[in-house]
Swiss-Prot record:
Name recorded for this polypeptide: Uncharacterized lipoprotein MG185
Lipoprotein keyword on record: yes
Organism (species): Mycoplasma genitalium (strain ATCC 33530 / DSM 19775 / NCTC 10195 / G37)
Keywords: Cell membrane, Lipoprotein, Membrane, Palmitate, Signal
GO cellular component: plasma membrane
Record membrane topology: Lipid-anchor
Family: Belongs to the MG185/MG260 family.
S-S pairs: none
UniProt main location, coarse: membrane
Length: 701
């Protein structure tokens, strides 16, 4: 069984292929005993900070004869793919001096290590705190003893389905039949297109509608109008919310195949097939969604999927009766087996076709979007009411909701949020009075820290990456110089809520295109971009999704309602050991045992294990038995995921792990995204393109 894998671009396939062919010649080797245990990480800032804290705690409490632990950062952007590439390079080089002892990564890394006999078993570590079902993925990793433990699920995440309450309220209110007593709310802005949709009267649907109404009322109560709204009728409050949502979504249209004569039930969110059908009907009912190319601030889709691969894999596993023999690939006799994929008569292949076509209907109506790696996540679009609902990893909870007033940049079809007003800063244009012809701009960061932008050469009293950036791109240089003599003032078209055609420095992972978004290197350890011709908007509370306005449900547990077993995806990086030498292996396990089992007092006076401390700080789920039964301290995403993990009737799905399964996942992801961007791609084209992408590495297994 396997947790979530890495995303690799085609540019990485060369080194991967090299490793595939060469690793058979790389045998087990000992690292130099340097007297310390190195933990390599590519985690987020919040997780890195908590790891630094627990390592400091361990080093201060350990026995003087025990080895200290040191944190090694491989990629500050959180790219587990880059972490894996670094590990592969060190294996190929037999790097005895710069390798590490532990890493957080996905479990196919164990399979990679095992091909060089460099895996480290945790059989002697006390893992009794874990719920045993969360350790069972170890017996579904290729090339290792299925009865041993090599990967510890210390940072688990699940998937949830998040409904944008105000948006969905507007959609349903617009489409509903006026005579339907279940919904008494006025349709949005007295829409003249009277709906004919019927709302079911079962208890589950009634309960959901109550939550949607509450979300719409809450959305209407902005800080500026709260007093007014508190004196208004409930129907006027929800209508105020609907009016705001209509600005983005436009008018509802009664069309065949849309919500016309449709019966809405809450159970539509329980399986992928019905959910895709519902989303398709919504897409047909709003003409703004029919536009293929959308600007960054416009409605984007009905349904956003955080991970297309996870959606397809869980739907496929559910439709195959929760049997890995009916999955796209599996592990047999400690080797990966792709026979189901290449056999068009197999249950897995036929199910794959049905599932693809279910999503294809939604794609054809411009109703589906997905995350593009290191680009705008679906959570960000939902935050600004540009989606009706989306699936998300529980780990993205901290990034999913807006504060009362949010600023963001609109750049063509991309958006960049100014998180906590600490990630986007306007570039101030230099003038002739600055007495430096190479100075082409300045930026004031938080705490009034000044950063200077130079062409050609930086002043001798400045340090690149600290208080200066050297701009090398000629397009960007020419843009900044052309603005140099202009007065920095608002144009007549600007309002207090908008800055148009401005230049900004942003700390963001959005991909540079060297046209409007330029990569300018690292600034104080963070990736910096300069964005030109951007519009900065300030979004009030009523035009954004607040945490209390979201309705968090379990991600669909079946492909269709008749599937016999409900499925819950388990994903996330594991703590993985790497062989070093006899002494360091012992010291590594000693630290891991402390990490999992020792109760420690932390700065907020809480007493918990280091593993619990890290998981709580980074919004991960730690599947300890005692924590699955107590969800009081969890956020709504994690609480929802835990509720299904704790359900004995739910089958946990974790992807089979092999050094090649990563390539399959990346191929599925890239080709599904291609189908979203190119509606001419049908199932046959999808399979042909995926087969070509996988190449001989997979075909010859």
């Amino acid at each position: 069984m396997k947790f979530k894998l890495f995303f690799l671009s085609s540019s990485v396939l060369g080194p991967i292929a090299l490793f595939t062919t060469a690793c058979s010649a790389v045998y087990r080797f000992d690292q130099v005993d340097d007297g310390k245990i190195k933990l390599a990480t590519v985690t987020s800032a919040s997780a890195s900070g908590s790891l630094t804290t627990i390592i400091s705690k361990y080093n201060s409490q350990k026995d003087p004869n025990d080895y200290p632990v040191e944190l090694v950062s491989l990629d500050s952007r959180g790219s587990y793919s880059n972490g894996k590439k670094d590990l592969q390079a060190k294996l190929l080089a037999k790097d005895k001096n710069n390798f590490y002892n532990l890493t957080f990564n996905y479990s196919d890394v164990v399979s990679i290590l095992s091909r060089s006999q460099m895996e480290l078993s945790f059989d002697t570590v006390d893992t009794s705190n874990f719920d045993p079902s969360f350790l069972s993925f170890n017996n579904n990793i290729s090339n290792v003893n299925p009865n041993s433990i090599y990967a510890l699920p210390a940072t688990v995440s699940g998937e949830v389905l998040v409904l944008n309450g105000p948006v969905l309220h507007y959609i349903l209110s617009s489409a509903k039949k006026d005579s339907n007593t279940t919904l008494s709310t006025h349709s949005a802005s007295n829409n003249s297109n009277k709906g004919t949709m019927v709302v079911a009267s079962d208890s589950e649907t009634s309960s959901l509608w109550t939550k949607l109404e509450a979300a719409a009322k809450m959305n209407a109560q902005t800080n500026e109008t709260q007093v007014l709204k508190s004196n208004s009728s409930e129907s006027n409050q929800t209508q105020a919310s609907d009016t705001e949502i209509k600005k983005i979504w436009g008018d509802y249209q009664e069309v065949d195949g849309g919500l016309k004569n449709y019966t809405f039930k809450a159970s539509v969110f329980n399986n992928w097939k019905d959910l895709n059908d519902f989303a398709t009907r919504i897409a047909k009912s709003f003409t703004k969604l029919q536009t293929t190319t959308k600007k960054g601030e416009e409605v984007q889709a009905v349904f956003g999927i955080g991970s297309l691969e996870n959606a397809l894999y869980t739907a496929l596993f559910a439709s195959g009766k929760a049997d890995y023999n009916n999955f796209l690939f599996n592990i047999k006799n400690q080797r990966i087996n792709f026979s189901n994929f290449f056999n068009k008569s197999s249950t897995a292949f036929q199910n794959l076709k049905t599932i693809f076509n279910s999503f294809k209907s939604l794609i054809d109506q411009n109703g589906l979007i997905s995350n593009a790696h290191f680009n705008t996540p679906v959570n960000d679009y939902a935050k600004f009411n540009q989606l009706a609902f989306y699936t998300s990893s529980t780990a993205r909870f901290p990034y999913s909701f807006a504060s009362d007033s949010v600023k963001r940049l609109i750049v063509n079809d991309k958006t960049i949020e100014n998180k906590n007003n600490k990630s986007v800063f306007e570039v101030n244009l230099s003038s002739d009075s600055d007495n430096n012809s190479n100075l082409i701009g300045t930026v004031s960061l938080e705490n009034s820290k000044q950063v200077s932008l130079y062409e050609k050469q930086v002043d001798s009293n400045k340090q690149i990456g600290v208080d200066a950036l050297l701009i090398k791109d000629e397009t960007l240089i020419n843009h900044l110089k052309s603005l140099k003599s202009q007065v920095s003032a608002k144009s007549a078209s600007e309002t207090s809520q908008t800055k148009q055609n401005k230049t900004f420095l942003a700390f963001t992972t959005v991909n540079a295109d060297q046209k409007a978004i330029f990569d300018v290197g690292k600034l104080n350890g963070k990736t910096a971009k300069i964005i030109i011709n951007a519009t900065e908007t300030t979004n009030a509370k009523i035009s954004t999704l607040q945490e209390k306005e979201a309705i968090v449900l379990k991600a669909p547990q079946r492909f269709e309602s008749t599937d016999p077993f409900p499925i819950a995806l388990v994903q996330g990086p594991s703590l993985i050991g790497i062989h070093a030498n006899e002494r360091e292996d012992i010291e590594t396990k000693k630290f891991v045992n402390w990490y999992l089992n020792t109760k420690v007092q932390w700065e907020e006076n809480s007493i918990k294990t280091p593993a619990e401390y890290v998981a709580d700080k980074a919004s991960y789920l730690l599947p300890f038995k005692n924590r699955l039964n107590n969800t009081n301290s969890y956020n709504e995403f994690v609480k929802t995921a835990v509720s299904q993990f704790a359900d004995k009737n739910v089958t946990k799905f974790a992807e089979p792990a092999d050094f090649l399964s990563n390539k399959v996942r990346d191929g599925v992801k890239s080709n599904l995204n291609a189908a979203i961007n190119n509606h001419s791609i049908d199932f046959d084209s999808f399979i042909n393109d995926l087969t070509d992408y996988l190449g001989s590495d997979v075909k010859n297994i």
